[in-house]
A protein has these predicted regions:
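A polyanion-binding, active-site-adjacent surface
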Residues: 6-154, 158-161, 166-168, 172-177
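Conserved small/polar residues in nucleotide/adenosyl-binding loops
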Residues: 183-185
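Generic N-terminal amphipathic, Lys/Arg-enriched alpha-helix
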Residues: 1-4
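Extended, histidine- and acidic-residue-enriched regions that form the cofactor-binding/catalytic faces
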Residues: 179-181
Length: 185
């Protein structure tokens, strides 16, 4: 992701970084700082095959691990992820996972990216409009430009704002409601 190096010099990033540093000092913010860029550390640019775009990290204690929709071993599977597993089971007969840890997906080339990379404890969408959207939009632009035949899965209204920056002549785009909205019988 060296193509993003220039982003870290831009005004929005400097302002965003300052806001995030202050938030970590004064509030409980997820994920913890060491996991903030886990999506990028887990799935290198040249290995990306699928990009799943979510909203923001889980805001419950111990849930967010820096991968969209993922939680660590031993954490109860959140309803949105359980709905994803149920859809995979219903459509493809894939057994419902006992763990919500999606690190194996990331290791296989699935970039699990939220449009907003941080959130305040128990306050969903609390870091919306701080500047993360500018950064994640740039990430998608780089992937769309540099790679080919990537499957982009856009879940929820917040994720769909990037639809227009993906080159649909080179990539595949799947848009749907947020998995939390899915109803299973």
């Amino acid at each position: 992701y060296y193509e993003l190096d220039k982003e870290f010099q831009k005004k929005y990033w400097i302002e965003l970084s300052e806001k995030i540093k202050n938030s970590y000092k004064n509030r409980t913010i997820f994920p913890k700082p060491s996991l903030l860029f886990n999506a990028f550390n887990s799935t290198h640019l040249n290995d990306v095959k699928v990009v799943i775009i979510g909203q923001d990290p889980y805001h419950g204690q111990g849930q967010a691990n820096g991968l969209s929709f993922s939680v660590n071993e031993g954490i109860t599977i959140p309803p949105s992820l359980l709905n994803i597993f149920k859809e995979l089971n219903s459509d493809l007969n894939i057994p419902i996972s006992k763990t919500g840890n999606l690190q194996p997906w990331a290791n296989q080339g699935v970039l699990l990216l939220n449009t907003i990379l941080t959130v305040e404890k128990d306050n969903a969408n609390s870091h919306k409009n701080l500047g993360w959207e500018i950064f994640t939009k740039k990430v998608i632009e780089v992937i769309s430009l540099k790679l080919e035949n990537i499957v982009f899965i856009l879940w929820g209204k917040q994720a769909n704002y990037i639809n227009d920056i993906i080159d649909s002549s080179k990539h595949h785009i799947i848009s749907s409601v947020h998995p939390l909205s899915l109803i299973h019988i």
